[in-house]
């Protein structure tokens, strides 16, 4: 319950009380999207089959509701991502920090998302997952391979109002160890309108 209570407290303290948000969970297959969604929903770690069809979960934490869409990350599932861009409030893009051979593929998909006009003002939280595995990429290494070294906006409370800059930041995490993603969501929550 600690993570849920903490998450609720963060959102409430940042003015997201009684708000609704639509958040897309995107990334290549096996990055941890479904695992994260279930961890946020009921703090359970379960083995999942690859997501074959888009799924959504309504998460209520206190009086805050958000609808999270897990669209799958395999090649065929990526074709429908665009169908979910309308009225999205944030994108959480997961990358398997251990699977360095797929960084180029992940960068290609992320670049397509970042250049899509319908997502031009949408905040992006990039989560480098699986840092609990030895030899997983560091944050700097992941930023470099995703081409984000000079494009992130800062981890603190950065006022971007009127700047025409899209909030975008990288956080490293281990969903199975329940670490790192909370800080990412805290950062993201300040930019959800």
UniProtKB/Swiss-Prot annotation:
Annotated positions binding GTP: 30, 32-35, 129-130, 132, 175
GO-annotated biological processes: endoplasmic reticulum to Golgi vesicle-mediated transport; intracellular protein transport; membrane organization; regulation of COPII vesicle coating; vesicle organization
GO cellular component, one term: COPII vesicle coat
Ways its activity is controlled: Small GTPases activation is mediated by guanine exchange factors (GEF), while inactivation through hydrolysis of the bound GTP is stimulated by GTPase activating proteins (GAP).
Class of the enzyme per the UniProt entry, highest EC level: hydrolase
Catalytic activity entry: GTP + H2O = GDP + phosphate + H(+)
Chain sites annotated for binding GDP: 30-35, 129-130, 132, 175
Bilayer disposition of the protein: Peripheral membrane protein
A GO MF term: GTPase activity
Binding site for Mg(2+): 29, 70
Keywords: Cytoplasm, Endoplasmic reticulum, ER-Golgi transport, Golgi apparatus, GTP-binding, Hydrolase, Magnesium, Membrane, Metal-binding, Nucleotide-binding, Protein transport, Transport
EC identifiers of the protein: 3.6.5.2
Superkingdom: Eukaryota
Matching SUPFAM superfamilies: P-loop containing nucleoside triphosphate hydrolases (SSF52540)
UniProt note on tissues of expression: Expressed in most tissues.
Pfam families, A to Z: Arf
Subcellular location: Endoplasmic reticulum membrane; Golgi apparatus, Golgi stack membrane; Cytoplasm, Cytosol
Mediates recruitment to ER membranes: region residues: 10-14
Motif STAR per UniProt: ranges: 2-4
Bilayer-spanning residue ranges: none
PANTHER family reported in the protein's UniProt record: RE74312P (PTHR45684)
Subunit field text: Homodimer; upon association with membrane. Part of the coat protein complex II/COPII, composed of SEC23/24 and SEC13/31 heterodimers, that it helps recruit and assemble on endoplasmic reticulum (ER) membranes at ER exit sites.
Function of the molecule: Small GTPase that cycles between an active GTP-bound and an inactive GDP-bound state and mainly functions in vesicle-mediated endoplasmic reticulum (ER) to Golgi transport. The active GTP-bound form inserts into the endoplasmic reticulum membrane where it recruits the remainder of the coat protein complex II/COPII. The coat protein complex II assembling and polymerizing on endoplasmic reticulum membrane is responsible for both the sorting of cargos and the deformation and budding of membranes into vesicles destined to the Golgi.
Family: Belongs to the small GTPase superfamily. SAR1 family.
Protein name stated in the entry: Small COPII coat GTPase SAR1A
């Amino acid at each position: 319950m600690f993570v849920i209570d903490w998450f609720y407290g963060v959102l409430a303290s940042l003015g997201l009380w009684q708000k609704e948000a639509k958040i897309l969970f995107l990334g290549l297959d096996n990055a941890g999207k479904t695992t994260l969604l279930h961890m946020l929903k009921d703090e359970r770690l379960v083995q999942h089959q690859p997501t074959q069809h888009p799924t959504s979960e309504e998460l209520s934490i206190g009086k805050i509701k958000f609808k999270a869409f897990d669209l799958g990350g395999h090649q065929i599932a990526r074709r429908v991502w665009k169908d979910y861009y309308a009225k999205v409030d944030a994108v959480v893009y997961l990358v398997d920090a251990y699977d360095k051979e797929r960084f180029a593929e992940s960068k290609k998909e992320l670049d397509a998302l970042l250049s899509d006009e319908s997502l031009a003002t949408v905040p992006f939280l990039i989560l480098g997952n699986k840092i609990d595995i030895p030899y997983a990429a560091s944050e700097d290494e992941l930023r470099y391979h995703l081409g984000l070294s000079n494009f992130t906006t800062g981890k603190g409370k950065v006022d971007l109002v009127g700047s025409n800059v899209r909030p975008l930041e990288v956080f490293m995490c281990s969903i199975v160890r329940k670490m790192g993603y909370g800080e990412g969501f805290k950062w993201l929550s300040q930019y959800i309108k």
